């Protein structure tokens, strides 16, 4: 989640001279709403968030660097359909993030040449929501979280 983007960004920066060059990192909304769960994953994505900001400064003006921090988009392999639905229904917009939404955000970053060093929370408002089940707690939710954070 961090090493490969760092290496690719560094090598890409050596290859470009001028033009409309972009690096768009896929981060995670968890960098905006930290929890103690998924520790190593969240830590690596927080590192990618910081790398996005510092790379934008380092690579300018040749390369613009931005990020997208999606919320619930696709059910992970260890997650039940019911759990995934519960997760996205707990967001303020009560909908999962559509892959087309992410593609549109990539297009937005490419077309808007005055944007660099920004990370867009594309998460149906999940990073704003302080009353999600993982924050509210409860024995059932804690068991589910611990199962997925192994």
Where are these regions (language model features)?
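Conserved mid-core alpha-helix of short-chain dehydrogenase/reductase
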Residues: 3-11, 53, 96, 101-104
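Acidic active-site catalytic centers that drive phospho-/nucleotidyl reactions
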Residues: 1, 45, 66, 101, ...
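Catalytic loop of short-chain dehydrogenase/reductase
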Residues: 3-7, 17-47, 52-60, 72, ...
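A glycine/serine/threonine-rich, flexible loop-to-helix segment
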Residues: 67-91, 130-149
């Amino acid at each position: 989640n961090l090493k490969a983007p760092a290496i690719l960004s560094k090598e890409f920066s050596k290859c470009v001279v001028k033009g409309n060059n972009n690096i768009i990192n896929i981060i995670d909304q968890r960098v905006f709403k930290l929890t103690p769960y998924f520790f190593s994953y969240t830590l690596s994505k927080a590192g990618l968030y910081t790398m996005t900001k510092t790379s934008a400064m380092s690579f300018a003006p040749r390369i613009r660097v931005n990020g997208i921090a999606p919320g619930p988009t696709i059910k992970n392999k260890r997650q039940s359909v019911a759990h995934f639905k519960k997760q996205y229904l707990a967001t303020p917009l009560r909908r999962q993030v559509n892959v087309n939404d992410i593609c549109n955000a990539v297009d937005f970053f490419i077309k808007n040449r005055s944007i660099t060093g920004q990370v867009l929370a594309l998460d149906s408002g999940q990073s704003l929501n302080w009353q999600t089940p993982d924050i509210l707690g409860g024995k059932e939710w804690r068991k589910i979280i611990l199962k997925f954070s192994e």
